[in-house]
């Protein structure tokens, strides 16, 4: 007479896998090894109509139905959520589709077709963004790149590029920060190409001088180091320590020269100054001044013109 299950000797752990287990198959009781059953169970798909396997912590499990976890979820390796790809060591993707985190410790929070390809790089979301520099960040937007330079940042916007070391583009469209530590706040097609250069906004502006700044406007240039353009259109501060506050087509072309406003004014002498008006020129060195008016020329050393039209101060200290 057979024994009841309660009468059998107790099992002993750990199992080696070659223990025999009884199973009914095609109306016949058959024996199989424990390892053969576990191989089947761990290789099956979860949530399908034909399979009802048991999950195992010793193999990769594939669930096709909704799962709920009560409590904490932790992982010592990679984390992938959504239809995305993780390649980098300890990289993680929290959601979205078509994302790739190939850098070590790289992360992507979500979005579509984003790439974090360098170590410790991060993409927050958006579409077709790329964080390719070490410790670089793209917050969101579309088609943005934080690459080449270490710790480069793009906050958002469209088709912006931060390639300089520790450079940043906060937003806007098609802006480029290629200088180390350079910053663009926003706008359209602005370029901060020199170290520590800054463009707050506007369009088609270029800050090419070291530590130069453009506040706004359009088609403005700072090619001198430590030069500044406040705004306006087509202004050029093209020598060191020069400034153009605003206006149209104004230029400061010698050291310490400045133009405040107006149109087509030029301060081309050392420490020269044009206040406003149109087509005025202060070309004399040692602080020549044309305050306003039209077509005036202060070409003498320390010369001065207050206003009027077509006046010339060509002698030393002429007024």
Language-model-detected regions and their locations in the chain:
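Register-specific beta-strand positions within repetitive beta-rich fiber domains
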Residues: 1-3, 19, 25-26, 35-38, ...
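Extracellular/surface-exposed low-complexity repeats and stalk/linker segments enriched in Gly/Pro
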Residues: 1-14
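Short non-domain terminal segments
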Residues: 13, 35, 44, 60-61, ...
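Short, mixed charged/polar active-site loops
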Residues: 29-31
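Periodic small-residue-enriched repeat registers in elongated scaffold domains
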Residues: 70-319
């Amino acid at each position: 007479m057979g024994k009841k299950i309660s009468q059998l000797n107790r099992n002993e752990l750990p199992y080696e896998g070659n223990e025999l287990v009884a199973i009914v198959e095609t109306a016949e009781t058959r024996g199989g090894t424990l390892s053969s059953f576990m191989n089947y169970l761990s290789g099956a798909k979860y949530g399908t109509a034909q399979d009802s396997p048991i999950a195992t912590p010793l193999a990769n499990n594939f669930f096709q139905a909704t799962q709920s976890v009560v409590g904490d979820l932790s992982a010592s390796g990679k984390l992938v959520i959504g239809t995305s790809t993780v390649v980098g060591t300890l990289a993680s993707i929290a959601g979205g589709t078509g994302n790739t985190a190939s850098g070590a410790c790289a992360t992507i929070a979500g979005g579509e077709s984003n790439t974090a390809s360098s170590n410790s790089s991060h993409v927050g979301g958006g579409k077709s963004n790329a964080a390719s520099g070490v410790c670089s960040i793209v917050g969101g937007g579309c088609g943005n790149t934080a690459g080449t330079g270490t710790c480069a940042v793009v906050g958002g916007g469209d088709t912006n590029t931060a390639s300089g070391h520790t450079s940043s583009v906060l937003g806007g469209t098609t802006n480029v920060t290629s200088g180390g530590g350079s910053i663009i706040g926003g706008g359209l097609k602005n370029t901060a190409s020199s170290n520590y250069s800054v463009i707050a906004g506007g369009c088609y502006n270029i800050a090419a001088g070291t530590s130069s700044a453009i506040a706004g406007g359009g088609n403005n240039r700072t090619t001198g180091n430590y030069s500044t353009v406040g705004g306006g259109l087509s202004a050029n501060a093209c020598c060191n320590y020069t400034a153009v506050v605003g206006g149209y087509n104004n230029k400061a072309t010698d050291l310490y020269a400045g133009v405040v406003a107006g149109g087509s004014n030029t301060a081309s002498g050392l420490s020269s100054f044009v206040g406003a008006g149109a087509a005025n020129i202060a070309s004399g060195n040692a602080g020549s001044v044309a305050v306003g008016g039209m077509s005036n020329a202060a070409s003498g050393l320390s010369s001065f013109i207050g206003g009027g039209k077509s006046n010339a101060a060509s002698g030393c200290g002429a007024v």
